């Protein structure tokens, strides 16, 4: 390392250490908050049994496995099919503050992108150095004159910590990491990127089109542009672009930006196995360059297999019967052919189109397609009638003057085609290529279709010429240039494997620039005789070059090795057992990793005889070269197909699908003359007819047997035993520069001896992009149906798991951006340590470790990576280099547009102006949107039925105001005490019996659905329920739509009696899911998806059994309906509107399509609120004194002793040294004294208010502490302030847990001075919590829950009506045998047959010709098979 580099590194370490020292005091919790005498006390604790029935079950279930999960069902072959390994590249982490403007940073990036420094980005990673601030960052909240003067300092930046020594105690690392995490803000908000159209090109901007073309296509001098035409390049797809005809070249340019992290298509398909022709049905998802398939669409983190389309060759329809549209199609890769069967012919065509586009993109380097054809190389130009409505020309061109391979390019012109063809023919009237003798030209191969661009690659032709030795014609004219293109050739399967290179992929301009320099010195070809002779002198195959000279990745520095498919990966050679070729060297097994040894061991896999392509290759060369060359030949394959953007060295690697290790490797070290233990074992597995050779082999090598057993057997045993023992391994510093291509990882020397780094194998196992960087690995158990032993991988973007047990193929891929929190808990088994990963919208995933030290290390490493991931711009969707490449391609595209405008010809008509805008994404219209998503032509009478506190009523006021703005008549039926408030907003009111304060008292004193609650409710609320049902029936008369909170209990029966559409709406989860527990049954510790799902079943059952008798009597007496039950009501099929934010409660994957998480329904009343002067003065004084201001209020909660609670709050505020706005609200509602009476004198640091609008109040404070009600929680989160929640009952525990999981606040289970004061200090000083809360607040403020809810009502209106029609058609004695029937509506939204059926069904339904039975039959069979939209699935 250079001295200046070393000094920079030391300076970085010093600055990192200095940054830690500066902030250590600020992030450490002060001593006064550490411990307290009242740590275990709770001033709000009740005297009665306050334990929920569900809590008791959860506590008793600690010895019961509630975490049984559906295991992924594998087909007969799976994902890892021997794909080549990949070279990692670096991604740049932007560490500038989230509060800073990006202008300066973008300018810096622009300068970087234009400099030559970027050429070396594949080896270096830049580290930005910026000053950190000691001040606490504040969120951008609702503007207020009281807060405008407050400074908004920047938040601290991430610094790389030095590599931890191997013997560093894990506790020290944990404490250090916790200190860093508390300091570190979390940037979940994507950075504001500059519009590409606004990026100025700071280079010297040539004005002429000729100079632009010289820059883009790297001509030596500007060439006059004769003509330019919009045209289409015809390959497997049609690519729209422009043809530029200059004096020396015919150039084609198309802007083809890549799209990262985008699901292109998803749906059900049937797939046949490798050896089993039976088709198995899977859920497929096409994302980026990978086609993944799953046994369960809700388990997207457990793929059954992956198909890497970067190695794809083609996707095509397979005709089974002539004249009929086929539903079968195939996907070919360099290794094998995959067979698929779609549900319909249009669906198959859509899949093939999508796959062809992805394969085409993946074989292009950069974000633009460039083809440069030298005119002197063109043989002829012919008309080709491929498309009837377009003029198409075929250009035959010689690739270079060494191989004389002929390529064909097809271009179609939709306008001015005749003129373009005449110009081209005149231009190539007399070229050097036409003077080359015919015997030198390579014959065209017929393997490719007529539209392929490359009929035969240069390497194939060169190989044939070297083997057959054609005579060279010295009088052939020389060709000065070669064809250059960013597109790679597509070879037939088995012809080769993907190319490999240690270089990062370059942008299109870099590719052109560097290929130009190489082409000046002529092209290089490979001499097979020389290669095979010199093979043993090198550890890797010689570099060879294919005809695509445009990509440097295919030139000098490629390392070629043969790569077998997984079926050929475990090769038992039939050569002489005594030869070194027949038996692998010692490094094949003893130098492999433990998992490779286990998978490749003959103990677990019976050896089979498999033929390898290399055998035939050797034989062919033997026939040509003679017997003398037999001992020196090695299997060499032809030119390799290139994957996407980044190439990497080829290595034999572990094939997870077949459990095998490739034995054939061209790039292996010198063939060992000595035997190995594993070679003897493998030799013993050969057929008996080779026994003579085997005996001779033993006789020759028996003298060295003792040395072999002593030296090599321990390597095998130690690695396998070490794998089963478990452990951990770090491959780099947690957030530093990857060391895969710099130096062997710590303790990983053996793993790297075969040339493949652990990071390479990791990326191959999970089909991850080449720039994915491996940080650490661990051995542990994944808790599913049974504990599944395997290996855990943590990278900079993903958390992965791979099972190691023989016979299992489970893989788990979890993006770090989907992780909400990581908790450490006790294991399910005695002596094991547990790790719980909370995932957005998914059930928790549990892991177990046999050592607590490994569990702690894994938790800290994972948390650090998750936090770093949130800092990365665009959440790591694109690396910095890819962004730079995309920007450069965009700049080239805009420059061409600008240059063309100056010489716009008559050829550019309107239909081709779309090409200027780049590649537009294809948008598929949802067929249901045009049918169901409509606004009613006439105003509707909408009634909202709810009971409870003020927080339960307020969202309905906001919804009704939105509906009134749409022209509808609204009414709210609730408790009498809210009448004035509701009518003040112009909403009609209808009374419902019941005292919310009495209900609140029972809930608080007894807990929700506890034993004492059930006792008191059954004794006191029998009459109350009867009154509630009767009053609700009267209140809901004259309604067209009923929207009800399910806690009101009567709505679903009233809607059935009135025969009107019925919707449910609630503030807490009420629908069965595995992602979250029922809001009334939140356990102390996470218990997994099975427990979560069971809580809903138990609650529904218990709740219905408690009220079913009264409800059925009421139905028969007042509603004139038959008695019912849960099976007949089908409550899980009712359309549901959840009025909380999808950013707070992420919609689970198993929610049905009629379950909508709309966002909060806020009733903003702060605009008309005038705060009292003493309150504004108090706030101003707190700001002037530099004190943090908090809000404390427990709203609609009744406590046993409000005086003790007030005293505790006062003491905590004084201890935390903050100012407090105290709102007591209903906390003393049932007490005889007035609500304004204060039990103890309040100090000047506390200001008491009775009430204030949350939208105004929370914008004035720095943190809020409250009970965790849905409405109050939503208001504090929207304000972007940290939230402290002390739950009392009901859904408050659920939202408290969500706040803690999201990292935007603190959940406390008890209130005392020690706990509450520490929570106040942490909420006002933790930069991590403050920043996360600010980012979440910005996300919530962008939502409009009321508008989303209204549109959801419109969209699901017909579905709600269909439920009423189904019930009308049932006879009295109908038992609804199919009551639990559910359909999954998933798949192809553009299926024309499906759209037609929807319209037919809609028209028949309106005309009355469709019977209810037919309606149900159609919605079952056809929709299940045709599959409509993701997530329409009954829970």
Swiss-Prot record:
It comes from the Eukaryota. Residues 211-258, 760-826 form the GRAM domain. It is found in: Cytoplasm; Preautophagosomal structure membrane. Residues 189-206, 527-537, 729-742 have a biased composition (Basic and acidic residues). One of its GO terms (molecular function) is UDP-glycosyltransferase activity. GO terms for biological process: autophagy; carbohydrate metabolic process; lipid glycosylation; protein transport; sterol biosynthetic process; sterol metabolic process. Belongs to the glycosyltransferase 28 family. It comes from Sclerotinia sclerotiorum (strain ATCC 18683 / 1980 / Ss-1). This is Sterol 3-beta-glucosyltransferase. Sterol glycosyltransferase responsible for the glycosylation of ergosterol to form ergosterol-glucoside. PROSITE patterns: PH_DOMAIN (PS50003). The keyword RNA-binding does not apply. Keywords: Autophagy, Cytoplasm, Glycosyltransferase, Lipid biosynthesis, Lipid metabolism, Membrane, Protein transport, Repeat, Steroid biosynthesis, Steroid metabolism, Sterol biosynthesis, Sterol metabolism, Transferase, Transport.
